Amino acid sequence: MAKGFTVKADVPKKKAAPADEFSIEKAKELIRGKTVVFCLPGRGVSYIFLKAFVQLCFDLVQSGAQIQISQDYSSMVNFARCKCLGANVLRGPDQKPWDGKLKYDYQLWIDSDIVFDTEKFYRLVYMDKDIAAGWYCTEDGKTTSIAHWLEEGDFRKNGGVMNHETLESMSKRTKPFTCDYTGFGWVLIKNGV
């Protein structure tokens, strides 16, 4: 530095990252003493799924939750979901899950191709909503499982397809939001809904 000069400057201030309101400890408090029924439609899973599922089960039990598993298969996924709930089409439309005989606080639906971890589960719990879903990409890698209704004219213009969120639009979202449609691949439902 040149003789006679003194540099006086403040350290540049870092912009604070937006605070994530999520607290895993609060989510653990919400789930303590509760029963979660894992609803698993399908025939088989990958080792990636299996490792994540076993870890989630372990973490929930360690947090003081109880777990149950309801798994069934049909080539028609909507029927497989009904079977997971113990439903029977011959008993009509007014049925309760497992005929009301299974005591539970939450149903957690996980499709066999979903990649997840325990934190993602706790984020659903932390929302404390009747229905909370996580999003995931569909097979094209660009469209997501989340959609919004369109006005009838716009629906026709869109080829009869709802207005789905894209990978790009979801990357801009930082907080939970309301949607009109969600896939059932990763969804948490409270008892009584």
Question: Which residues make up each language-model segment?
Answer:
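N-proximal low-complexity "stem/linker" segments adjacent to membrane-targeting elements
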Residues: 2-75
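Residue-level marker for beta-strand->alpha-helix junctions and adjacent short loops that shape enzyme
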Residues: 43-45, 72, 114, 121, ...
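Acidic helix N-cap motif at the loop->helix transition within catalytic regions
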Residues: 48-50, 80, 119
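Alpha-helical elements of Rossmann-like donor-binding domains used by nucleotide-donor carbohydrate transfer enzymes
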Residues: 52-55, 83, 123
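Structured loop/turn residues at beta-strand edges in well-structured enzyme cores
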Residues: 65, 102, 127
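Short, conserved alpha-helix that lines the donor NDP-sugar binding/gating region
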Residues: 77-100
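Short beta-strand-to-loop acidic/aromatic patch adjacent to the donor-nucleotide binding site
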Residues: 94-115
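Conserved catalytic core of nucleotide-sugar-dependent glycosyltransferases
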Residues: 117-193
